[in-house]
Curated annotation (Swiss-Prot):
This is [Ala1,Thr6]-bradykinyl-Ser,Lys. It holds the Pfam family Bradykinin. One of its GO terms (molecular function) is hormone activity. Expressed by the skin glands.
Length: 11
């Protein structure tokens, strides 16, 4: 996974 990638993002 690329740096700064998050499976869950705060909306």
């Amino acid at each position: 996974a690329p740096p700064g990638f998050t499976p869950f993002r705060s909306k």
